[in-house]
Amino acid sequence: MTDSPRPELDMETQEFVHQLFDLARQGNSQRLEQLLQQGLPPNLRNHKGDSLLMLASYHGHADTVRLLLAYKADPDLRNLAGQTPLAGAAFKGDLAMVELLLAGGADVEGASADGKTALMMAAMFNQAEVAASLLAHGARRDAQDAAGLTPLAAARMMNAEATVALLSRPH
């Protein structure tokens, strides 16, 4: 089987597609819902592999995330860099979004291509509240990334004092 070239999109179509992803970035739930009702795929991804859910969650739009999850958007769909929406929310320290994604079925142990979990992201960037929530949802303290780093080791490497303290406590 040969790879067929991707179809070229005209400028009008390209602009429409760009606007779709802007709706997610901006949290325009009303317009997105209209389009989802008309058959817009909830797992549509852009040229970077970012899904509508990834963009809405990264930009903190809880209502849009709830909408996309209701339309069966995959909370574990990774972008081309291998990142999940949960890891993005953990990196940003958005506790409410982390909780929402977990409630929507996100895998607490879902790792990127280099083995980094959401707990590792929270640990590295000193997001102690998020790290505590992830631990409460079953994130593994002993998980290792491709370099063999645990969340605690990653936090130490980044001088993330609050998460070092949290992860150093007996569990």
Curated annotation (Swiss-Prot):
Keyword Repeat: yes
Pfam families noted in UniProt: Ank, Ank_2
ANK repeat feature ranges: 48-77, 81-110, 114-143
InterPro entries linked to this entry: Ankyrin_rpt (IPR002110), Ankyrin_rpt-contain_sf (IPR036770)
Keywords in alphabetical order: ANK repeat, Repeat
Name listed for the protein in its UniProt record: Putative ankyrin repeat protein PA3287
Classification of source organism: Bacteria, Pseudomonadati, Pseudomonadota, Gammaproteobacteria, Pseudomonadales
